Amino acid sequence: MAAPSNTAAVDQLTSDLANANMNGGEKTTVNTNVGASFTGEEIDTAGPTPSSAAPHPQASASLYVGELDPSVTEAMLFELFSQIGSVASIRVCRDAVTRRSLGYAYVNYNTTADGEKALEELNYTLIKGRPCRIMWSQRDPALRKTGQGNVFIKNLDVAIDNKALHDTFAAFGNILSCKVAQDENGNSKGYGFVHYETDEAASQAIKHVNGMLLNEKKVYVGHHIPKKDRQSKFDEMKANFTNIYVKNINPEVTDDEFRTLFEKYGDVTSSSLARDQETGKSRGFGFVNFTSHEDASKAVQELNEKEFHGQNLYVGRAQKKHEREEELRKSYEAARQEKASKYQGVNLYIKNLDDEVDDEKLRQLFSEFGPITSAKVMRDSITEPGEEGESKEGEESEKNKENKPEEKEGDDSKPEEKEGEDSKSKSKLGKSKGFGFVCFANPDDATKAVAEMNQRMVNNKPLYVALAQRKDVRKNQLEQSIQARNQLRMQQAAAAAGMPQQYMQAPVFYGPGSQPGFMPPAGGRGMPYPQGGMPMQPGRPGQFPAGFAAQQGGRGAMPQGIPPMYGLPGQFPPQGPFPQPNNPQFLAAMQQIQQSALAGGRGGPAGRGPMQGGVPVPGMPGGAGLPGFPPNARQQGPGAGRGAAAGRAPAGAPAGARGAGAPEGLQGQLAAVADNPGQQKQILGEAIFPKIQAIHPELAGKITGMLLEMDNTELVALVENDGALRSKVDEALAVYDDYVRQQGDGEGAQAPSKEEKTEEKA
């Protein structure tokens, strides 16, 4: 809408704001209830929110939708935004590894008029209980980060939300973005931002609203200062401080005595002793403000550590809360890094321990490799019958004592153990959790222990011995492993289906400008991704090409480049009709395929990769399957890779000529790649997986991974001997069940995610 330009309108608004109550009127919302159900109910637009006109440099039909609940999907947004007009594409931006929503999306309309209408009628609409924030998408990061026309407002009442703030400031000019800062619980932090299209509008808003009352609170309105500029000013203030903080003050000291102590160093503008509100007693600290920095600095130098009324004072520059928190964070991080480096390479994590192994037995097992500083077997905490009357402090102390080594697993810290535990303490030990820690004095001894003790049988159980790692390191490794396996499965599925090489492109396309994240437009059927030198079809000005996941700058996330047909390898030859990726129903189906690919692990039905049937793709004739695929191509498991494809024979071939799992065919394949042990391992896995799947289908993938740690010659023998294979499968199941039980006990403080449970290697 056009901004009022006449002075009378602005003056009238100013007078209205003088005693405005932001809760006085009925709050206008568009109650769609999209998150609860897809009823297609008509949107209530009785009181549309004033919005800005489209940016002047170019017409745009692309909208940025922020403040979304993590569970909001493309289908939910399509249900809402399609009521305004024809939607070209919708993309919810997600994390590249976890595929979790980042809380914002992009909606592309076919016409700019529909985009303007959506911005006018749907801004601050409740989606799954949270008001969304809509603005025009700005692809140029330089324009987003200039800060021109950006206004900062503080001392806002907690009842003022995004819409109320927008309504208040919309009269001064076109608003590009409006936001009230919120905490993790959705409560207002008391400040917000309004981004105008022009500096003139921002100046008008500051002139007329700064110092006015909103909900009986006087607000401050000023130009937004970038963080780097604020930091430089803050550093200057720190160097020229006048306010000092004093602590360790005797409670008997009066205000006059406190002020007199500092007045001899210069002119004091104010002094204050902190007192308890109920009793009025001094809390032992206070503040003194001088007129000049030199006087304040002199007082700090001469009074710090000086005795006053029998107590040594602490006198220093007064710090803001965020400064103190930052210093504490840095000191904690430094201590943690020092602790981690101290035990780097010497602390071992041992699991799959027998219940009979105690601390002493664990020490004896590893003592042959060098001096041991500590050895600890983790155990459950127990409560003796006669301990019910113990104090709460005692119970918490015992709990902390038992949990301390468990935290060590995540923090790579040294297990604590007192030497020479008495018999009474031993009698109170709980059941072993099946894992423990051994800390050596020398890294070389620890390395030798890992090499010698890993997989050694102790009480008929193979030990797992490795260097202890912090929790965040293990999590990063697991995420990288999951991503690599999912990519490998997609490539294997494409190869098994006979997909030509030119159709198996990387998921991110780099355009002529070498800028990552640009996706090619939806081409004709059978058209592969453009290669170097091929021009991309220009899109509508201001609108993202279909399948391009735009990234709003400065949000701390990597570019989200997902091809239009993510979950399917490349684009397919023209062997039948195929749905266009712009179709929102197709986007919803592709999202299901993505989730199936990420949720499926080495075992379980979901682990069969994105090519598995069961997820219907809209637009396919009769759900018959993917064009150009053999009828059974989508039903193959993870083993259906290159080796399985090589083992298939034409339909008319004799039965004996088929089956990649036959020993003769297997030996031939192994001989062909004799110089590549990794490829041999892959062939053996493809051959052994169907046999294991017939024995135990639910954990076939996980058991296959466990058995692949064996030597290749042993694996060949297992392929040829079903009895030996079944025996090994039973052993692997026993080890896995024991591992699951130990993990449930040892890491119960934080249950692993579904991906971790499925993908973690036993």
Curated annotation (Swiss-Prot):
<dbReference type="GO" id="GO:0005737">
    <property type="term" value="C:cytoplasm"/>
</dbReference>
<feature type="domain" description="RRM 2">
    <location>
        <begin position="149"/>
        <end position="226"/>
    </location>
</feature>
<feature type="domain" description="RRM 3">
    <location>
        <begin position="242"/>
        <end position="320"/>
    </location>
</feature>
<feature type="compositionally biased region" description="Low complexity">
    <location>
        <begin position="645"/>
        <end position="663"/>
    </location>
</feature>
<keyword id="KW-0963">Cytoplasm</keyword>
<feature type="domain" description="PABC">
    <location>
        <begin position="664"/>
        <end position="741"/>
    </location>
</feature>
<dbReference type="GO" id="GO:0003723">
    <property type="term" value="F:RNA binding"/>
</dbReference>
<dbReference type="GO" id="GO:0006397">
    <property type="term" value="P:mRNA processing"/>
</dbReference>
<feature type="domain" description="RRM 4">
    <location>
        <begin position="346"/>
        <end position="470"/>
    </location>
</feature>
<comment type="function">
    <text>Binds the poly(A) tail of mRNA. Appears to be an important mediator of the multiple roles of the poly(A) tail in mRNA biogenesis, stability and translation. In the nucleus, involved in both mRNA cleavage and polyadenylation. Is also required for efficient mRNA export to the cytoplasm. Acts in concert with a poly(A)-specific nuclease (PAN) to affect poly(A) tail shortening, which may occur concomitantly with either nucleocytoplasmic mRNA transport or translational initiation.</text>
</comment>
<feature type="region of interest" description="Disordered">
    <location>
        <begin position="740"/>
        <end position="762"/>
    </location>
</feature>
<dbReference type="InterPro" id="IPR036053">
    <property type="entry name" value="PABP-dom"/>
</dbReference>
<dbReference type="Pfam" id="PF00076">
    <property type="entry name" value="RRM_1"/>
</dbReference>
<keyword id="KW-0694">RNA-binding</keyword>
<feature type="domain" description="RRM 1">
    <location>
        <begin position="61"/>
        <end position="139"/>
    </location>
</feature>
<dbReference type="InterPro" id="IPR000504">
    <property type="entry name" value="RRM_dom"/>
</dbReference>
<keyword id="KW-0509">mRNA transport</keyword>
<dbReference type="InterPro" id="IPR006515">
    <property type="entry name" value="PABP_1234"/>
</dbReference>
<keyword id="KW-0539">Nucleus</keyword>
<feature type="compositionally biased region" description="Basic and acidic residues">
    <location>
        <begin position="389"/>
        <end position="425"/>
    </location>
</feature>
<feature type="compositionally biased region" description="Low complexity">
    <location>
        <begin position="48"/>
        <end position="58"/>
    </location>
</feature>
<feature type="compositionally biased region" description="Gly residues">
    <location>
        <begin position="600"/>
        <end position="612"/>
    </location>
</feature>
<dbReference type="Pfam" id="PF00658">
    <property type="entry name" value="MLLE"/>
</dbReference>
<comment type="similarity">
    <text>Belongs to the polyadenylate-binding protein type-1 family.</text>
</comment>
<keyword id="KW-0677">Repeat</keyword>
<dbReference type="InterPro" id="IPR003954">
    <property type="entry name" value="RRM_dom_euk"/>
</dbReference>
<dbReference type="InterPro" id="IPR012677">
    <property type="entry name" value="Nucleotide-bd_a/b_plait_sf"/>
</dbReference>
<keyword id="KW-0810">Translation regulation</keyword>
<keyword id="KW-0813">Transport</keyword>
<dbReference type="InterPro" id="IPR045305">
    <property type="entry name" value="RRM2_I_PABPs"/>
</dbReference>
<dbReference type="GO" id="GO:0051028">
    <property type="term" value="P:mRNA transport"/>
</dbReference>
<dbReference type="InterPro" id="IPR034364">
    <property type="entry name" value="PABP_RRM1"/>
</dbReference>
<feature type="region of interest" description="Disordered">
    <location>
        <begin position="39"/>
        <end position="58"/>
    </location>
</feature>
<protein>
    <recommendedName>
        <fullName>Polyadenylate-binding protein, cytoplasmic and nuclear</fullName>
    </recommendedName>
</protein>
<dbReference type="GO" id="GO:0006417">
    <property type="term" value="P:regulation of translation"/>
</dbReference>
<dbReference type="InterPro" id="IPR035979">
    <property type="entry name" value="RBD_domain_sf"/>
</dbReference>
<feature type="region of interest" description="Disordered">
    <location>
        <begin position="596"/>
        <end position="663"/>
    </location>
</feature>
<feature type="region of interest" description="Disordered">
    <location>
        <begin position="376"/>
        <end position="429"/>
    </location>
</feature>
<keyword id="KW-0507">mRNA processing</keyword>
<feature type="compositionally biased region" description="Basic and acidic residues">
    <location>
        <begin position="753"/>
        <end position="762"/>
    </location>
</feature>
<dbReference type="GO" id="GO:0005634">
    <property type="term" value="C:nucleus"/>
</dbReference>
<dbReference type="InterPro" id="IPR002004">
    <property type="entry name" value="PABP_HYD_C"/>
</dbReference>
